[in-house]
C-alpha cells in the first residue's frame, strides 16, 4: 500500500524548458535567438548537471546559474547580450515568474496532502532549491527535501532516494516516485520504489500527460 510519495522538480513541478521562462523575456526585449535553441539548452543543462554537485552554498550556486545562462544565451547566438542577461536572470531568482510551475503541480500536491500523504523532493539541484520552492509556493507541501548538491550524490544514485524514504519513515515498497527522466526511474527502481514517468510536454506516449493523473495510482 502506498503511504508516501517523492517528486522530482525540474520538468515535474517546475517547467525547465527555456521556451517557458527565457523566450518570453527575449521577445519582450525584442531579441530573437539566431542559434539552435534546443541544442543550446541541451548543452547548457549538460554543463549544469556536470557541475551542480559542487554548488553546495548559495554563492557557488548563483555563480553556476550565471554561467548556465551565459552558455545558453551564447548557444542561442546572443553573445552580445549574454553577460548582462545572465546576471539579470540570476537577480530575478526570487521572482516566481522565473520558475513557471507545471500545470496542475500545486493542485496535485495540495490534494495529496489533503489525503494525508507525506511528501518529499528527490532532485538533482543546487543549494538554491529550498528557497526556490518557497518562492513558488510549493515548499509548504513537503516534509523533506533530498537535494543532490546538499546530500552529495545525484540521481540515479539510490542513496538520494533512501535519504528521502528514511526521512518520511516508509519502506521503498510503500512509496511512489514521480519524475520525468530516466535517472528518476533507475534510481527509484534500484531501491525498490515504484516510479511514475511524467512528461509535461506530452512528447512521451508512455508517460503521464498530466500531473493530476498521479492520483489515479493511489488508493
Go through each PLM region and give its residues:
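A short, Lys/Arg-enriched amphipathic alpha-helix followed by its capping loop at the start of a domain
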Residues: 28, 108-117
Amino acid at each position: 500500500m502506498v503511504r508516501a510519495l517523492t517528486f522530482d522538480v525540474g520538468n515535474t513541478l517546475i517547467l525547465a524548458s527555456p521556451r517557458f521562462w527565457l523566450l518570453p523575456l527575449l521577445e519582450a526585449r525584442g531579441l530573437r535567438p539566431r542559434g539552435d535553441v534546443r541544442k543550446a539548452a541541451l548543452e547548457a543543462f549538460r554543463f549544469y548537471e556536470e557541475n551542480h554537485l559542487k554548488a553546495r552554498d548559495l554563492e557557488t550556486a548563483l555563480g553556476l546559474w550565471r554561467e548556465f545562462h551565459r552558455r545558453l544565451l551564447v548557444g542561442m547566438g546572443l553573445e552580445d547580450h549574454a553577460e548582462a542577461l545572465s546576471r539579470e536572470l540570476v537577480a530575478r531568482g526570487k521572482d516566481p515568474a522565473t520558475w513557471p510551475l507545471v500545470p496542475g503541480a500545486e493542485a496535485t500536491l495540495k490534494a495529496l496532502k489533503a489525503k494525508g500523504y507525506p511528501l518529499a523532493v528527490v532532485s538533482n539541484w543546487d543549494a538554491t532549491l529550498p528557497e526556490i520552492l518557497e518562492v513558488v509556493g510549493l515548499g509548504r507541501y513537503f516534509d523533506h527535501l533530498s537535494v543532490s548538491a546538499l546530500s552529495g550524490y545525484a540521481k540515479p544514485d539510490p542513496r538520494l532516494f533512501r535519504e528521502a524514504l528514511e526521512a518520511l519513515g516508509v519502506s521503498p515498497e510503500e512509496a511512489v516516485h514521480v519524475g520525468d527522466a530516466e535517472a528518476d526511474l533507475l534510481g527509484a527502481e534500484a531501491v525498490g520504489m515504484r516510479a511514475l514517468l511524467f512528461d509535461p510536454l506530452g512528447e512521451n506516449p508512455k508517460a503521464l500527460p498530466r500531473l493530476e493523473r498521479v492520483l489515479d495510482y493511489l488508493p
